């Protein structure tokens, strides 16, 4: 198998986090991430980008992709849709709390570079979910009843806090922010996975007109299921894999049979999760890969898992990172036109922070870790 990796920029003293990655039609890669003195509380946070020309060894100097001065611009994702429109999604944090996130997007058709794409449109993903407070309260009640005694006090405090926010119209509509790239289904529908830190669950923004207008799916209410990555099975079923944000220590998973409008129960996959982001992609071979921290504690191990049965089992695992310390996390993963798999992730070590890009193939994953 093939594998190569490099840092996108030299280790940097500031906070650099949450990458997106896309392959452009000419074969170059474009990566996005945010940089600043912190996260939601830092008003100097901007969205940066860098390019890797096809066949090149080094990435370009970083350039600005988005900056709303005075506001933190956070989690990024990039996407090239079927019509070759380039999308950048990211949230602007209005009051330095995640619950005030408003997801913005920019589109471009002139993106060959150098530097930032020429943006031709900027908009907001305005969402008005159908009132979900009754359903959420019902699910909270049954979830609480099933909570083991040792976690009961923590769960009660968590649900009390969420309960107060459930009836608030503004909080139901604000705070839905992106992390993983959208999925374009075979019908052409855009499915943008979003999550709320107010409620600690997820929701999809759906567009059937190429992103001109967006509407909210029914929320995926599992309390502690955030940052979904969505993959489509051959039969059209959508599967959402989510970061665990509660006490279960496993990847959360839900399925939709109607293109993301409604979702079944949020369950757990047989994959460990320490409360960190993951991403997945359906390969040209029909196999699926998931890039995730495969521990219950810490982010110093980053794995690629491969499934041959569309996510039912994950028999092959190989590590991008398995270190004693550091954080290697928040991956974004795509497959290029030539079959190469590209994973980009936040790379935090003692000396600073960067994004790391790894390029590999399916054979490399199958071979497993070197002894």
What positions do the PLM features span?
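Asp-box/BNR beta-propeller blade signature and adjacent active/binding-site loops
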Residues: 1-371
């Amino acid at each position: 198998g093939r594998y190569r990796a490099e840092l996108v920029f030299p280790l940097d003293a500031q906070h650099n986090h949450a990458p997106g990655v896309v392959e452009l039609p000419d074969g170059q890669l474009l990566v996005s991430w945010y940089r600043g003195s912190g996260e939601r509380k830092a008003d100097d946070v901007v969205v940066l980008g860098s390019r890797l020309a096809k066949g090149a060894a080094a990435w370009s100097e970083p350039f600005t992709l988005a900056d709303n001065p005075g506001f933190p611009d956070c989690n990024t994702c990039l996407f090239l849709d079927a019509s070759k429109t380039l999308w950048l999604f990211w949230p602007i944090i209005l009051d330095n709390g995640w619950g005030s996130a408003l997801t913005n997007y920019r589109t471009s058709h002139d993106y060959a570079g150098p530097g930032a794409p020429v943006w031709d449109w900027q908009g907001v993903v305005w969402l008005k979910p159908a009132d979900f407070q009754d359903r959420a309260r019902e699910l909270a009640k049954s979830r609480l009843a099933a909570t083991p005694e040792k976690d009961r006090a923590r769960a009660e405090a968590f649900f009390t806090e969420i309960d107060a926010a459930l009836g608030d119209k503004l909080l139901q509509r604000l705070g839905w922010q992106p992390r993983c790239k959208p999925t374009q289904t075979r019908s052409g529908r855009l499915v943008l996975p979003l999550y709320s830190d107010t409620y600690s669950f997820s929701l999809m923004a759906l567009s059937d007109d190429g992103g001109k207008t967006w509407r909210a799916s029914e929320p995926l209410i599992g309390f502690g299921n955030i940052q979904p990555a969505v993959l489509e099975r051959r039969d059209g079923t959508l599967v959402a894999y989510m970061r665990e944000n509660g006490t279960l220590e496993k990847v959360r998973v839900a399925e939709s049979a109607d293109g993301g409008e409604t979702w079944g129960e949020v369950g757990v996959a047989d994959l460990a999760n320490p409360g960190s982001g993951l991403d997945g992609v359906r390969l040209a071979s029909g196999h699926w890969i998931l890039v995730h921290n495969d521990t219950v504690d810490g982010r110093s191990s980053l794995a690629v898992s491969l499934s041959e049965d569309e996510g039912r089992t994950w028999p092959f695992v190989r590590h991008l990172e398995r270190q004693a310390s550091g954080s290697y996390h928040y991956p974004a993963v795509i497959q290029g036109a030539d079959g190469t798999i590209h994973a980009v992730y936040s790379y935090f070590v003692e000396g600073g922070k960067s994004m790391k890009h790894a390029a590999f193939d399916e054979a490399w994953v199958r071979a497993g870790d070197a002894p």
